Regions:
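C-terminal motif of bacterial Sec signal peptides marking the signal peptidase cleavage site
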Residues: 15-18
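Short, low-complexity S/T/E/D/G/P-rich linear segments that nucleate or cap local secondary structure
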Residues: 10-13
């Protein structure tokens, strides 16, 4: 009797695990759509990048309705990630949506997806690597576009994490031989430790990509 009971329990555990796996797969499949919004008949999709060239905080409109995240918005001023967010019409094919007090770039869904190309309005600068550690880089900014608000404050060394460094060896990200090299740094979020009297290096909140030139 005990033997049959153990067999029955094993079968039930197998079925439970199989059901959980199926449910997990279904939930994953249902969460396919990234954040999207429909404005003036066009659906825009979140690029994941912050627009650092916004100089006016006035919104052109507001997201008024929302649908489930598993759906695409079907009418104007509707999103699949919430309502109440302001938006600005930007350059052709792009709008900005104000999320957590930051203007996030959304791209026309019908535009060719250049997944490796970062929009020109995202904060970036050219720099020289002055020190390379195994998990970080120290750089000094050598060239910054005049249109960026932070040009006048990047006067100290800048510390960079390397999670998004485009430099690998044997399939692993590495900082080997990078001292003295030129890099292009794309970032977003807060710029910390900018005070001249602060001896700590400048710290960038979000590093989108570091490209070695």
């Amino acid at each position: 009797m005990k033997k049959y009971f153990l067999i029955l329990m094993a079968c039930l555990m197998f079925l439970f695990a199989a059901c959980n796996k199926t449910a997990s797969s279904e939930n994953k499949a249902e969460s396919n759509y990234p954040p999207m919004v429909k404005v003036n008949g066009t659906i825009y999709v979140d690029t994941g990048y912050e627009n650092a060239m916004v100089t006016c905080g006035t919104a052109d409109g507001q997201i008024k309705t929302t649908v489930d995240g598993r759906k695409m918005p079907s009418k104007d001023d509707e999103s699949n990630f919430g309502k109440g967010y302001g938006y600005q019409i930007w350059e052709k094919g792009y709008i900005n949506v104000q999320i957590d007090n930051r203007w996030i770039l959304f791209r026309d869904l019908d535009l060719k997806d250049e997944s490796r190309e970062i929009p020109e309005w995202v904060a970036h600068f050219t720099g020289k690597v002055i020190k390379a550690e195994s998990d970080s880089l120290m750089v000094e900014a050598t060239q910054i576009d005049d249109r960026f608000y932070f040009k006048e404050i990047m006067t100290k060394p800048i510390s960079l994490s390397i999670e998004n460094l485009d430099n690998s060896k044997d399939g692993k990200v590495t900082t080997e031989d990078l001292e003295g090299k030129t890099v292009e740094v794309y970032f977003g979020g807060e710029i910390k430790n900018i005070e001249p009297e602060n001896s700590d290096p400048i710290f960038l909140e979000n590093i989108y990509r570091i490209i070695v030139k």
